[in-house]
Amino acid sequence: TIDDTVIGDGVKIDNLCHIAHNVVIGNNSCVVANSAICGSAIIGKEVYIAPCSVIRNQIKVEDGAVIGMGAGVTKDIPQDTVNMGFPARTIRVRNEEDWRIY
């Protein structure tokens, strides 16, 4: 089914981004240039999606995750992790110092 796309408070969306039907983007997330979020994906709060990334349909990206530049997300992404590559893989878990920078 095609439902509403919901974009939370404080979300920043850069130019040339594609956000499909039934997508939910949590508060204070950031979607940077030329990224695509396919249908029925759920993006948590305070998620950073770098340029030229693609998030496949029906994927869940948990709160605080980082998606690196050009990543292709084909599986659910755990909370507070840094993910890169094509297909995207978890590189590491974010630490307290990362949060101060972000």
Where are the model-predicted features located?
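Structural signal for interior beta-strand "rungs" in well-ordered beta-sheet cores
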Residues: 1-84, 88-90
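Terminal amphipathic alpha-helical/low-complexity segments used for targeting or macromolecular assembly
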Residues: 86-102
